[in-house]
């Protein structure tokens, strides 16, 4: 665009916005817009749901989404590390002990759009700044007819902040330990029945040394990070009961794992359009597109940890995802009927150099494919006095196509050129739920459900290495499915107090796991040579993972006090009789039995905000054979916001205040990697 035309365009935009800035009176009554989707279904009364409100989201000591989600015990990532030091591919989420795999078994959505990486299924947490979030709803348990494939353990629904959540201008700048800096800002512009928001976040730091002091060597150094994200959101009324919502966001993520040749790089762009009708006939129509690109390096380190060498350069992982979702809700007295359909298509591949000799790659690999799921669903909920009964179901057709694995030497000799057979099939999803309110604030609920998940392209086609260990691919993996039942009670003790208790049991059929087949040294199919410090693994479908447990929640909010307690117990066991697996009866990797999170907050009439959060996660196994155990982890975080004036506040934040050693991983030689140590922050907020 020529400079003159750009100046005219910007001037026109400013002119259009000037009535708002000047406070010009509206022409007629404005239509209220919220930017949100349809209200939760009536069936939610029979579901185990935890809600994290905006006030709590903004009081996270780290300011990171994965830390906020830890308020819900039982909702966990594959690793204890957060997105400042973890390998991005390990950042999945799951619920109720359905672990053992770094692909997400819970579905995370933002304004209706799935956020899992199209190729690998991991979550790019730095892409979602907490300042732009209005509310988080966590529904435990599978069988979501509305959201469909991927919601095995449950669903995490994130809503963007509404106009009532935001100030016209909000800027935050924080400095922290190890030269950490965190800057965030947002703008909101409202005009009659429309609003637009723009937000940005920047985080960087020198990082900490991931390897614990007792194991580290000269090759170990701090793990720096640099992350940027931005989002623009526009919402306007198209009529008295119809909203048009447009979202555009982007991120760039760079981090290092604490030794040379272990860089992670990722960036992406998401866009979506959603129409929401909130009249007598409620309806929603969403379309979205995602573009991602990821790169990662892996290194081998010598016995004395004095030197590292590059062994794999995953120089590009381009992927795209797109989809659509539509539903209509009809209310007829005590009956709510919801009908809809959706689809999601993903395509991606990994491009990498491997088998290094004297510091130079000798081979190249390209592996990937595409998949498509399409489904239709229905949900009927009847409310008759104190009783709510819900029956929902959906049918999905899935297909996996164009899978390939190509390997060649850099001199041009083809080593592998495999084109995998296309596959397709059908999968059902369903949930039957009931809730009864006998009085006295009690709500007794029970449900039975079935859900499923399609293997990611990463699981199907990409062999990988993690340190000395190597894992072979398996293009014949079947979809996972889950069946489960649960029962519980919600008790509104008073207007300011609520308690909940739920017991559950579930079985994950065809659970995908990285199964240890042999120990090095040796040369193995699909991965090549593995040294004596490593293990050879292969992705396989286990018979099942059986999980059962209990969850307890308590909220007390007699202003100015705010108390939140969440506890989860899970007994998860592998059920597998396949010869050579030797996993039957063992716990899935990275799956703790006990998790608890407790927060006490206080807000003064003059908006002084204080909170203290303690979390405990019991010991868990690093590996599928249950030979390496990560110790229990206990942390205490603190937050304080001190108002200086109407528009200025000073903040103090502390992560892991007692500087506990949080074990995040143990290699086969016993080397321990830790998660974030004590980190202190000083923050200035301008509104």
Regions found by a protein language model. Give the residues of each.
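Periplasmic-side early beta-strands and strand-to-turn transitions of outer-membrane beta-barrels
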Residues: 144-145, 157-159, 164-174, 178, ...
């Amino acid at each position: 665009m020529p400079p003159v035309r750009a100046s005219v365009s910007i001037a026109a935009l400013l002119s259009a916005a000037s009535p708002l800035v000047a406070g010009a009176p509206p022409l007629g009554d404005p239509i209220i817009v919220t930017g949100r989707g349809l209200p939760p279904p009536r069936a939610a009364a029979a579901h185990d749901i935890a809600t994290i409100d905006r006030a709590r989201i903004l009081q996270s000591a780290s300011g990171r989404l994965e830390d906020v989600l830890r308020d819900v015990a039982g909702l966990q990532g594959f690793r204890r590390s957060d997105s400042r030091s973890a390998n991005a591919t390990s950042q999945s989420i799951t619920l109720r002990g359905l672990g053992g795999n770094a692909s997400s078994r819970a579905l995370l959505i933002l304004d209706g759009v799935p956020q899992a990486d199209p190729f690998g299924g991991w979550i790019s947490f730095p892409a979602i700044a907490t300042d732009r979030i209005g509310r988080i709803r966590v529904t435990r348990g599978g069988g979501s007819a509305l959201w469909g494939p991927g919601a095995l353990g449950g669903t995490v629904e994130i809503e963007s902040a509404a106009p009532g959540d935001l100030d016209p201008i909000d800027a935050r700048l924080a400095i922290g330990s190890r030269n950490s800096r965190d800057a965030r800002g947002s703008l909101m512009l409202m005009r009659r029945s429309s609003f637009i928001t723009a937000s940005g976040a920047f985080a960087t730091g020198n990082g900490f040394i991931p390897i614990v002091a007792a194991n580290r060597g000269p090759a170990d150094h701090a793990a720096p990070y640099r992350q940027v994200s931005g989002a623009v959101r526009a919402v306007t009324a198209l009529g008295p009961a119809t909203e048009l919502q447009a979202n555009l966001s982007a991120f760039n993520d760079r981090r290092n794992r604490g030794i040379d040749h272990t860089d992670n790089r990722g960036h992406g762009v998401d866009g979506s359009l959603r129409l929401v009708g909130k009249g007598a006939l409620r309806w929603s129509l969403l379309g979205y597109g995602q573009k991602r690109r990821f790169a990662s390096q892996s290194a081998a380190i010598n016995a004395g940890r004095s030197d590292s060498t590059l062994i794999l350069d995953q120089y590009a992982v381009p992927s795209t995802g797109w989809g659509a979702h539509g539903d209509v809700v009809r209310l007829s007295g005590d009956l709510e009927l919801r009908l809809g359909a959706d689809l999601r298509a993903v395509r991606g591949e990994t491009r990498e150099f491997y088998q290094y000799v004297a510091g130079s790659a000798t081979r190249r690999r390209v592996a990937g494919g595409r998949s498509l799921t399409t489904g239709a669903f229905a949900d009927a909920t009847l409310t008759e006095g104190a009783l709510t009964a819900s029956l929902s179901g959906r049918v999905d057709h899935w297909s996996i196509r164009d899978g390939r694995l190509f390997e060649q030497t850099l001199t041009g000799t083809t080593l592998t050129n495999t084109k995998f057979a296309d596959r397709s099939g059908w999968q059902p999803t369903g949930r039957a739920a009931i809730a009864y309110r006998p009085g006295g604030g009690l709500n007794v609920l029970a449900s039975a459900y079935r859900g499923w998940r399609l293997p990611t392209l990463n699981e199907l086609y990409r062999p990988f290495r993690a340190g000395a260990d190597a894992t072979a691919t398996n293009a014949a993996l079947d979809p996972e499915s889950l069946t489960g039942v649960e029962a519980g009670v919600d008790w509104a003790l008073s207007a300011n107090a609520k308690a909940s208790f739920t017991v559950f049991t579930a079985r994950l059929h065809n659970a995908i796991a990285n199964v240890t087949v042999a120990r090095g040294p040796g040369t193995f199919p699909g991965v090549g040579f593995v040294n004596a410090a490593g293990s050879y693994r292969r992705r396989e479908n286990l018979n099942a993972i059986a999980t059962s447990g209990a969850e307890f929640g308590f909220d007390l909010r007699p202003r100015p006090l705010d108390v939140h307690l969440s506890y989860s117990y899970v007994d998860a066991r592998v059920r597998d009789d396949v010869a050579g697996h030797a996993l039957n009866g063992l716990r899935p990797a990275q799956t703790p039995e006990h998790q608890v999170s407790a927060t006490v907050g206080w807000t003064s009439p003059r908006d002084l905000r204080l909170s203290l959060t303690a979390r405990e996660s019991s010991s868990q196994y690093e590996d599928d054979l249950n030979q390496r155990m990560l110790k229990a982890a206990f942390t205490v975080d603190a937050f304080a916001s001190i108002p200086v004036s109407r528009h200025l506040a000073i903040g103090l934040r502390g992560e892991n205040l007692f500087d506990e050693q949080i074990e995040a991983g143990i290699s086969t030689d016993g080397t321990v990697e830790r998660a974030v140590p004590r980190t202190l922050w000083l923050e200035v907020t301008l509104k």
